[in-house]
Amino acid sequence: MNDVFLKALPVLQKLTTAGFEAYFVGGSVRDYLLNRTISDVDIATSAFPEEVKEIFQSTYDTGIAHGTVTVRENNEFYEVTTFRTEGTYEDFRRPSEVKFIRSLEEDLQRRDFTMNAIAMDEHFALHDPFSGQEAIKNKAIKAVGKASERFHEDALRMMRGVRFLSQLDFQLDSETEKALESQIGLLQHTSVERITVEWLKMIKGPAIRRAMDLLLKVEMETYLPGLKGEKKALTEFGSWDWGKRTTDDAIWLGLVVTVQPNNVNAFLKAWKLPNKTIQLVSKAYQYALKMKETWLAEELYHAGKAVFSLVNELNIIRGKENNQHKLSQAYEALPIHSKKDLAITGADLLKWSGESAGPWVKETLDKLECGVLCNEINNEKNQIKRWLGYHEE
């Protein structure tokens, strides 16, 4: 049995010893059946939150309104969630009410896909009321119950379906795909932050080309930030070898290179990305558009290591040669890496010239910066002084 389950087993055993049902549920059970790596587990129980808190010494109310209590066991943290049913979904994401129950099957019934509605007990026996194992065997992504109802409850489930297709190389069953196509407009009610998470997971999947084909077939791109009408760009984007990526930044750079938005900053901000990512990708954009492989010393200097490394990463994804080592060597060989590395400062210029401060100081330092980069002058204080026409002291 997987070590992750074995380590968490005492949590289930404490709950069952206290007279409650407890199971491993969701993605961890699915991934176990698929022999995929399991990083963490989710636990569902018939114990109500207050009952869970009585059983364990160390607990945290991380989502108690929805029945989730985080418990600490053997220096590990586990989310333990009470079986529940949910009321109507008025905003296509959150239920109007949550009701705690004692039935495992009713709890599994509210989940998105049958492959995610399998439970495993403390003896590692599987409880599979919706034939999730059969779906896994057939590589099918099938909604629990009516697909249209599941998507109406949480519109993000449509994007999750496409993401699972990419990650698992599965296929949506016909009813689920039809419901996805007919209800795709509900995606507009989903927060951008949640969409961004699913988008990144989808791109990283081994079956990204098939996932992108389905995404475009159902016109999901219409409801993704800045991608309406970009079928051609997304087809190209989906054809690249994203298995070679090492950073998420490369995904965003690849997207702006194919879409070529009028305002790269605004496009990236619409995806609610961190400012650091927006700044890096925006700076790398013009270099990446040219599929730059050969760089002048001045270009390496102004771009910086983070930018030329990102452009090189995207080139690899697009089937070009990996020039990282050569570029890094050329960058390290530069006489300076920023204006701060110059052997003199504006204060030196004022002292040597006897003149007042003004725009000329920046202009002179810019000229010197270029001269040092082009090897016209060594970055040495006395040589710079002579080069600028000042007499040595």
From Swiss-Prot:
Reaction(s) the record says it catalyses: a tRNA precursor + 2 CTP + ATP = a tRNA with a 3' CCA end + 3 diphosphate; a tRNA with a 3' CCA end + 2 CTP + ATP = a tRNA with a 3' CCACCA end + 3 diphosphate
Domain of life: Bacteria
PANTHER family: CCA TRNA NUCLEOTIDYLTRANSFERASE 1, MITOCHONDRIAL
Summary of the function given for this chain in its UniProt record: Catalyzes the addition and repair of the essential 3'-terminal CCA sequence in tRNAs without using a nucleic acid template. Adds these three nucleotides in the order of C, C, and A to the tRNA nucleotide-73, using CTP and ATP as substrates and producing inorganic pyrophosphate. tRNA 3'-terminal CCA addition is required both for tRNA processing and repair. Also involved in tRNA surveillance by mediating tandem CCA addition to generate a CCACCA at the 3' terminus of unstable tRNAs. While stable tRNAs receive only 3'-terminal CCA, unstable tRNAs are marked with CCACCA and rapidly degraded.
Database matches in InterPro entries: Bact_CCA-adding_enz_type3_sf, CCA-adding_enz_C, CCA-adding_enz_firmicutes, NT_sf, PolA_pol_head_dom, PolyA_RNA-bd
Gene encoding the protein: cca
One GO biological process term: RNA repair
Record-listed E.C. numbers: 2.7.7.72
Name under which the protein is recorded: CCA-adding enzyme
Keywords of this entry: ATP-binding, Magnesium, Metal-binding, Nucleotide-binding, Nucleotidyltransferase, RNA repair, RNA-binding, Transferase, tRNA processing
Subunit note: Homodimer.
